[in-house]
Amino acid sequence: MADQSNNMIIEEVNKGLNPGTIVLLVVATLLILFFVGNYALYMYAQKTLPPRKKKPVSKKKLKREKLKQGVSAPGE
């Protein structure tokens, strides 16, 4: 390309990384580290924590379930 003074405009070759690329790499790296860390904590918790206790089923719910199945509830 030539401008008005007949000088050639030389496009500079971009050496190094684009700032947008650097930001993208940093964000992607942080996301990957976050998910890997969460997975590691999850696996550690699965090995070390005792299993969760189930909530006790209320007598009212037991009675309702037995009535649905056709079995008479005790005391009736």
Curated annotation (Swiss-Prot):
Gene: S1FA1
Keyword set, alphabetical order: DNA-binding, Nucleus, Repressor, Transcription, Transcription regulation
Transmembrane annotation, as ranges: none
GO CC entries: nucleus
Superkingdom of origin organism: Eukaryota
Name of the protein described by the UniProt record: DNA-binding protein S1FA1
Native source species: Oryza sativa subsp. japonica
Motif (Nuclear localization signal): 50-55
PANTHER family tied to this protein: DNA-BINDING PROTEIN S1FA1-RELATED (PTHR35298:SF11), DNA-BINDING PROTEIN S1FA2 (PTHR35298)
Job description of the protein: DNA-binding protein that specifically recognizes a negative element (S1F) within the RPS1 promoter.
Main location: nucleus
